[in-house]
Amino acid sequence: MLVAVDGVDGAGKTTLADELAPMLGAAGKPVIRATVDAFHYPRARRYRLGRSSPEGFYRDSYDYAALKATLLEPLGMGGSRRYRRAIFDVDADRPVDGIEEVAAAGSILLFDGIFLHRPELRDYWDFSIFLDVPCEKNHHLSRQPSWNVGLPDPSSPDHRYAEGQRLYFRECNPKRAASIVIDNVDLAAPAIVERL
């Protein structure tokens, strides 16, 4: 089973996935944790449209073909169960020789990241969660001054991220595509607000 935890930067995706993993494990389900952040493109590709380009952030951040080939397809229905959790170290800006692992039968992939309801990914998910946190309430970026006043200053690095997220919302409508939408403004009290 492939489960996606999607939401804007700083919405609490990794936190929620990390909290769900041991619960599923305690219920006797083998869990594989992975993140889209291990599938970045190299820096040259990510910034080919410019360091402040929202379009570049949305279109060129992640290597979805590699994600599908090395993780989603092997773990999907009829897949080989031989997978890799990572292909790229974004901090070192270099590929990693990720260890090929073999999933136990019945494993659940709990995968977190941004942009997970893009057309090229959405059909892979057996279940998906979208964490609904407005940009101004974003747990990470709300501390950045430019995020607190609506649209970030176009010269701010935050402009790339905020407008890239808005592009994703316009093109993919992740709230509509998700199996459930969780209001995660209050990390201590998440609330399901929509279900398919």
Question: Positions of the model-derived regions?
Answer:
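Post-Walker A helix-loop "phosphate-sensing" segment adjacent to the P-loop in P-loop NTPases
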Residues: 22-32
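P-loop (Walker A) phosphate-binding loop of NTP-binding proteins
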Residues: 8
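Conserved nucleotide-sensing/catalytic segment adjacent to the nucleotide-binding pocket
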Residues: 32-35, 41-94, 108
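Conserved lysine of the Walker
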Residues: 13
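ATP-dependent NMP and nucleoside kinases share a basic, alpha-helical "lid"
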Residues: 93-147
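Hydrophobic positions on the alpha1 helix immediately C-terminal to the Walker A/P-loop
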Residues: 16
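NTP-dependent small-molecule kinase module
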Residues: 123, 127, 131, 140, ...
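Short hydrophobic/aromatic beta-strand immediately N-terminal to the Walker A/P-loop
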Residues: 3-4
